[in-house]
Structures are given as structure tokens and as C-alpha cells.
Design a protein with these regions (language model features):
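C-terminal scaffold of the Radical SAM
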Residues: 1-167
Length: 167
């Protein structure tokens, strides 16, 4: 996404943007088949903030192939220094029949105990940085919880607009 596209989205009234950063390790991004680098992800976050987005969320993947506690610590440390207000952190699950399954990626992933340790490490790091956990995989600075998610969990009405949206 370009800075101009980000400005157009902001001017159109879009008030929350979620970016699929996934990791700030170039080695991990390459293993995941992502097309962006860590630096490009960082630059996109700053460009979104400059375009006027004050409610910025980043997706983060945990329990990645060959991921270590040190690598995750570095990613989360860099991530929380960015002008973001929300993080969604998900464990990688390799499903049968997917390209990752065919490539035997699961064999390189941490075992369940290590994955749990990585998750708890991320929870702690995010909490120390002021991101409060409000769902199993979601963390936000005060007042920046996903309104859709909160409405969903409280059985309140919401309106879905756009491709694949539902209400």
C-alpha cells in the first residue's frame, strides 16, 4: 500500500487500519512467503500514522518455524515502539493440504509447550508495553479495543460493509 492510498483511505473516513505485519524478522517473513520485509512493514506503519490513522493494529504470528524466544522478543520490542494501538497475536497452525503442510513446515515449528511459552512471552511483553489483553489473541491500549469484536462478544448489533462482510 502506498502513502497516497493511505491518505485516500484516511480522507474517506476509514478510522481503523489493521496491517498484516506477522513478524519483524526478515528470515521469518521469507519462511512465511510474505512479500514484504520488516523495514517495509515498519515504513508502512509510519506512513499510515502520517496519513492520519490514530487507530492502527498490527497482526503478529507466533510459534513460527524455527522461532526462538529471543527472535520473538526482538519482534515484539520493535513492534511496540511503533505508533500502533492494537496487536492481534495468533499461533501458526499448519492445516493439512495447505502449501505449508506439503512443504513440511510443521516439522520446523515449535512443539506445543514451546508455542505456549512463546504465547505467554508475547502476552507479558505486550502487557508491559501497555497493551491490555481483552481477548485470547487481542491486545490494545486503553480505549482502542476492537469495537466490532466487543459488540460481537456482548451480542450487540453491528453492520458489516464490504466484500465478505456480514451483519
Amino acid at each position: 500500500v502506498t502513502p497516497e492510498q493511505l491518505r485516500e483511505l484516511s480522507h474517506a473516513g476509514i478510522n481503523r487500519l489493521s496491517l498484516g505485519v506477522q513478524s519483524l524478522s526478515d528470515a521469518q517473513l521469507k519462511r512465511l512467503g510474505r512479500l514484504h520485509t520488516a523495514q517495509e512493514a515498519v515504513e508502512t506503519v509510519y506512513a499510515a500514522a502520517e496519513a492520519g490513522f490514530r487507530n492502527l493494529s498490527c497482526d503478529l504470528m507466533l510459534a513460527l518455524p524455527e522461532q526462538t524466544a529471543d527472535e520473538l522478543e526482538q519482534t515484539v520490542s520493535r513492534l511496540v515502539q511503533l505508533p500502533i494501538t492494537h496487536v492481534s497475536a495468533y499461533l501458526l497452525k499448519v492445516e493439512q493440504g495447505t502449501p505449508f503442510a506439503v512443504q513440511h513446515v510443521a516439522e520446523c515449528c515449535p512443539d506445543d509447550d514451546t508455542a505456549a511459552d512463546l504465547y505467554l512471552q508475547a502476552v507479558e511483553q505486550l502487557g508491559v508495553a501497555g497493551f491490555l489483553q481483552y481477548e485470547i489473541s487481542n491486545f490494545a491500549k486503553a480505549g482502542f479495543e476492537s469495537r466490532h469484536n466487543c459488540k460481537y462478544w456482548h451480542c450487540e448489533p453491528y453492520l458489516g460493509i464490504g466484500p465478505s462482510a456480514h451483519s
